[in-house]
Structures are given as C-alpha cells and as structure tokens.
C-alpha cells in the first residue's frame, strides 16, 4: 500500500496520515508526550520520500497539485508542536520539538518548490512560497509575544526563521542553487540558536552544515565553470545570487562568532 503507484492510493494514504498525525498530536498534548510529534514527523516524511522515489513523475501536473496540498497540510500540522513546547517543561523534549519545527519549514520549502515547478503555473512562485513561510512564522512570533509569557528562546527561533526565509526569497526567485542556499541559511540560524541557548547539539549541527555548505558551494562553482555561456549577464543570474547569499551568510556567521 505504501509504495503503490495507483492513482487513488496516494490520496487515501496521505489523507489517512493527516488524520493519524492530528490524533497523535492531540494525544501528545493530553499526555505531555513530546516524543510523539517527532516520531510522526519522521514517519510522515519517510513515507513521502518513498512515494516521491517510487510513484511520482515530474510530468504529473494533477498529482503535483494534490501533493502540494498535502505538503501544505503536513506543514501546518507540524507547526502545532509549538503548543507542545508551551505545555511541556522538559528541556530535552523541547529540543526535539524545536528541531521538528525548524526542519519542517525547510522541508516544506523544498517540497513546495518541487511541486510548484511541476504545476505549470504562468508565473514564478518559488520565491513567493519562501516569503509566505516567512510571513507565517512572523505571525507566530507576534502571537507568542502577545501571550505575555516567557517564551524568549522559542521567539528567537521563530524570528530566526523569519529572517532566514526573507533573506533567501530573492535568490530562490532568481533560481539560485537551493541546497546551497538552505544549508548556508540553516548554518547561520543554528549558530544563532546555539549562541542563545548554549545547547551542544546546535553547535555540532552547525559544524556539519559548515562543511556541507562549503562542499555544495564548490560543486556549484565547478558546475558554473563547466556549463557557463557568454550570453549570461554578470549579476542577474542564479550563480551570482547564490554566491552573494553565501558570502553574506558567511559574514553573518563570522560576526556571530566574533561577538559571542
């Protein structure tokens, strides 16, 4: 059932998973089980990944529309762990939930770009999706601040997401190299979270992302050297947008390291 490519099966599968995820979230709130949203998050995107590898073709416009709707639904479902963080006092559980919230934003953008590109829209929408994600996180930041409770670290994390997705909107709209952009942005975001929390897992994740960003950027440069044409403009192209963003991200990273 999970790997079937029947036209209707994936609709049933992802509808069932949506209901199951909502039920697990409700149970996690009632029992204060912070692990349940993490398990549901991993399971959901593993199944989504299996379907994309086995049952998805890039020419399927109507399937892309359906999957974009489900990806959006999953995105909002996995923003709900914010409520769990507000109720669960255990620090270790909250770390896992916060990582789910952060990763959820980046996965949604990646999946959204994939599906939007196959929907045949008459305009470029990838950068608009990034801006929409930033706006959603900004609304959550405003809501948390209006609650007048001490959720400072959660607010910092959400505000970091707002700044991250606003900053990558233009490079994405110019068809920048998405993986490099995501890793560079997340590298700075996780360093900021480490500076604010001093949680070791963020430090180690930042170190890994530094290496991944460097390798990915060097691969991008190599591809540009091998495939560039004389007709491309110097500035208004994806390679320049990616290089500019990586440079700014590296500068922000160095500034954070120097100040803290």
Segments predicted by a language model, with ranges:
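Glycine-rich phosphate-binding loop at the start of an alpha helix
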Residues: 164
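Extended, compositionally biased regions that are outside compact catalytic cores
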Residues: 1-158, 167-260
